């Protein structure tokens, strides 16, 4: 499928696969509880874990992140350029769905400059959920063909290439700089 078709599927609250910096991600509209539930069911992912959101700019995260709790130094860390994709744990707004935050009062976000992510966010007007495109016990998909093999020939997948990152994103807490996952 092309970008416009995938964007329309996202607007229709479907779960789609799209390329990110290292692997294909499964994504949906984070403001649609039904879409997020479909994603969690598909991945067999416990709601308590929460999800990562990706977007090309901070504006896409405004509905979810409590920016009033982020100081200027932390904001510059958040917007910094890093050698590897970096996901930040940040304060969530109290109105952010527990389907996104899990059992936490924070949410995981990543500024992503991958052209596919940027285009989909701009076409839809919202950030995307991002969890690796793979079934439990299977390796993350690195091509659209691998997505189709794991999820079926009719699964909506953006047939573009992943970035050149070798590993999933590093995950750090913005307030403490604690490392949760090495990238």
Swiss-Prot record:
Give the E.C. number(s): 2.7.7.87
Q: Which residues form the signal peptide?
A: none
The molecular function terms of the Gene Ontology recorded here are: ATP binding; double-stranded RNA binding; L-threonylcarbamoyladenylate synthase; tRNA binding
Which InterPro entries has this protein been placed in?
A: DHBP_synth_RibB-like_a/b_dom (IPR017945), Sua5-like_dom (IPR006070), TC-AMP_synthase (IPR023535), TC-AMP_synthase_SUA5 (IPR050156)
Q: Which residues form a coiled coil?
A: none
> What's in the GO CC field?
cytoplasm
- Catalysis: reaction(s): L-threonine + hydrogencarbonate + ATP = L-threonylcarbamoyladenylate + diphosphate + H2O
Q: Which domain of life is it from?
A: Bacteria
- Give the UniProt keywords, A-Z: ATP-binding, Cytoplasm, Nucleotide-binding, Nucleotidyltransferase, Transferase, tRNA processing
UniProt enzyme class: transferase
Q: Which compartments is it annotated to reside in?
A: Cytoplasm
One GO term of the biological process aspect = tRNA threonylcarbamoyladenosine modification
The residues covered by the YrdC-like domain are: 1-183
What this chain does, per the entry, is described as: Required for the formation of a threonylcarbamoyl group on adenosine at position 37 (t(6)A37) in tRNAs that read codons beginning with adenine. Catalyzes the conversion of L-threonine, HCO(3)(-)/CO(2) and ATP to give threonylcarbamoyl-AMP (TC-AMP) as the acyladenylate intermediate, with the release of diphosphate.
Q: Say which family it is in.
A: Belongs to the SUA5 family. TsaC subfamily.
Stated name of the protein:
Threonylcarbamoyl-AMP synthase
- State the species of origin: Haemophilus influenzae (strain 86-028NP)
**What is the phylogenetic placement of the source species in the record?**
Bacteria, Pseudomonadati, Pseudomonadota, Gammaproteobacteria, Pasteurellales
């Amino acid at each position: 499928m092309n970008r416009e078709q995938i964007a329309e599927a996202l607007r229709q609250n479907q779960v789609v696969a799209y390329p990110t910096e290292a692997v294909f991600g499964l994504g949906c509209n984070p403001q649609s509880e039904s879409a997020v539930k479909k994603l969690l069911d598909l991945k067999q992912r416990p709601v308590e874990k929460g999800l990562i959101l990706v977007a090309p700019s901070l504006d896409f995260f405004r509905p979810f992140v409590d920016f009033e709790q982020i100081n200027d130094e932390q904001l510059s860390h958040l917007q910094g350029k890093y050698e590897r994709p970096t996901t930040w744990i940040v304060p969530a707004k109290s109105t952010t769905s527990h389907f996104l935050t899990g059992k936490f009062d924070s949410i995981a976000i990543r500024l992503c400059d991958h052209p596919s992510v940027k285009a989909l966010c701009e076409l839809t007007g919202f950030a995307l959920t991002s969890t690796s495109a793979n079934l439990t016990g299977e390796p993350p998909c690195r091509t659209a063909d691998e997505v189709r093999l794991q999820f079926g020939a009719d699964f909506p997948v953006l047939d573009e290439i992943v970035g050149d990152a070798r590993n999933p994103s590093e995950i750090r807490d913005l307030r403490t700089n604690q490392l949760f996952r090495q990238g």
